[in-house]
Each structure stands twice: as C-alpha cells, then as structure tokens.
Amino acid sequence: TKENYDCEDKWKFLIKSKEKDIAVTPWLNYDIICKDRNEEGGLGFMSFKNAANSQHNNGIGGQWIIQEKLSNGPFLSSMLPKRNPPLSTFRIISSSKGGLHVGQAKRNDIRALSCVWRAGRENAATDHTAILFNVHPKTGEILKGTLNTHWYHANPANKKITLSTHSYTHHPDTNKLITGMIVENIQEIMDFVEDAHYKLIPHVPLCGWDVALCGEKNEKLLLEGNFSCNFFRGTFEEMYYFEMVE
C-alpha cells in the first residue's frame, strides 16, 4: 500500500518509527546556519531549513533532517581506524510475505535474511567506501570481506569491468584481523530489524536496513530503510528467498 512506501521519505520514516517506539537516530528540531570561518561577502554562508520545522512549506517542513553526528560504540570502534572513521553500519536485508495473502501481515511473515558489516575507512565521511564483511546471520561470525566502491563510479565502455572477491580478512587501514570476530548479539539485531519491518512496512517484500551500534553500551539505532536494496554480497537464505519471489 502507499502508506507502507511513505517510509521512503527519510523524514516520514523517522516520525513513523518514533510513533511505533522503534529506536532511530535522534534529530534536532530547529533550523541551522553554517558559516565558513574565513570567507566574506556571504560566500561562506549556508542556511538549512529543518524538516522538523512546520513553519516551512505550508506545514510540510524543510528539506533537511538535521542531526547530531553519532559515533561507533566500543565494539565496532575496536575494529576500526582510530582517526576519523565514519559511522560503520550493518546492512541487513529483511523480507515479508505479507503481500502474498489477503488481510493483515503476521509477525511470522517477516524474516531477516542477511547481514553485512561495512567497515569504514580512515577519514571517510560515510561507509560507502567501506570493506563489506559478510556476517553469518545465525552465528554472528564475521567472515571475509569484499568491495563495492566500483558500484558508485561511471564505467566507460572501453574500461575493464571491476570484479571483486571475498578476499579481505583484515582492515586495510590498520591491518587488524576482522574475520573470525563475533557479533555476539546478532540475533537481537536481526530481531530488531524484523520488528521494524513488521511495524513500519509489513507489506513491502524486501528492505535493506542500516543499523548502527552507538554509545558506550553499543545501543542499536536504525538509520533508515532502503527500498531499492541488494544483499551487498552477503550470505542469505537462498531457498527461502527464491521460493518467496518465485
């Protein structure tokens, strides 16, 4: 239904999640301005209208979701570079069979299928240049990693197509061994995603969720749901998935 797909709007996603008591990234409620410390003549000035401010756009709110920058919790930080790593999230794909039958979806229609941890690089703004470490969805064991940075670059017709394999066992910036580490609360994280899928978008067949572990207690926070998603090279329950889409 259209209501399910409203959550593609990142602001509506946050509001609906809060209404459903789902832990998401906190936001600020006021507009902000940013000034360059040296530029003059108004050249270094930017004004951002907050989506939370209903005074903009006839009550719809502004274009920008304004949030305080979050940091990785101790568990993930122990595997990341010390110098300015980005928030390094788990990408978890969940599925729903709720659209295959008439009436309301049931909780057991929802299943989390795969998990990949995006180990961010030193001084990167986001985890889009990360090493994608496959995480076993049942045991939480972090397996080998691969790349997908070439997905975000135009590829001229005369340029050789980039292929990558699961060959990374260590973080390239620190040489720290990642493969073999255990995400001990993997089931808790997968359940967290399944609950979000059920409460927010029970009839959407597939969604990719970005989950962060933040603060001293490695608090689970949902950043967003991605409706145009893929498995990011992660292990998934193939037979269950194939039967669902058949």
Which positions does each model-derived feature cover?
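Short helix/loop capping segments that flank catalytic or ligand/cofactor-binding pockets
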Residues: 42-44, 74-76, 102-103, 123-125, ...
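C-terminal active-site "lid" helix and adjoining low-complexity regulatory extension at the edge
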Residues: 164-188, 194, 198-206, 213-246
